[in-house]
Amino acid sequence: MSLYKNKKVVVTGGSGFVGTHFIQELLDRGANVRTSIHKTPLKIQDDRIEVLENIDLTKLDDAMKLVEGVDFVVHCAGYIGHPSSIPTDYQIGLNQINVITNVLEACYKQGVKRFLDLNSSTGYPDRRYPITEDEYWDDEPFISYYSYGWMRRYREKLMEHTSHLTDMHIGIARGTAIFGPHDNFDLKTCHVIPALIKRCLSGEDPFVVW
């Protein structure tokens, strides 16, 4: 039997690329899924999805409302900027911290049993060889993602601290160059792999990899 069968599961960031896939997978496994809409509509429509509208996770009251009465939370929400803006966009980092802090506090207060965070590989140091997970904290984050990478590291320490103080089971997935259906393929704002796919399908000739 699926761990998620008949469980109430919240997916934050359910209108985003990765959140969309989590919702579909959880529905397929028999979960009762709840998500929220802040600015962007959902990419999939299914009557089995409970949708709360106008939820702003930078506000603790909204986070409390979203996770009330649920068993598990899959946290995919975040403020995303174009890669070129990450080193300098102070507001992106601040909002990310506000969101994770509010969601974790809400989960603790509402008695959520399990919490999965979709984090990022931007916290890893710069290496000229295939890096391992154990090297995450060995050096400073890569300079192009320096402040953003430290924010991502802070998230993990915050979750580690929370797991020590509560009974909540917390897992972290460090996403690396994720791509696929429902991704952003706008060449002005997308990441490297979606851009390469879009350019390849458009018949670019010669095809130049940056």
Regions flagged by a language model, labelled:
Residues 127-129, 153, 157-210:
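NAD(P)-dependent short-chain dehydrogenase/reductase
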Residues 12, 36, 73-77, 115-121, ...:
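SDR active-site strand-loop-helix element
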Residues 8-29:
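N-terminal Rossmann NAD(P)H-binding glycine-rich loop of SDR-like oxidoreductase domains
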Residues 54-97, 106-109:
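NAD(P)H-binding glycine-rich loop region in Rossmannoid oxidoreductase-like domains
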Residues 101-145, 165, 171:
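Conserved Rossmann-fold NAD(P)-dependent oxidoreductase catalytic core, especially the SDR/UDP-sugar
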Residues 59, 98-102, 114, 154-155:
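Conserved cofactor-binding/catalytic machinery of classical short-chain dehydrogenase/reductase
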Residues 31-39:
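Conserved glycine-rich Rossmann-like NAD(P)H-binding loop of the short-chain dehydrogenase/reductase
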Residues 96, 148-152:
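Active-site YXXXK catalytic motif of short-chain dehydrogenase/reductase
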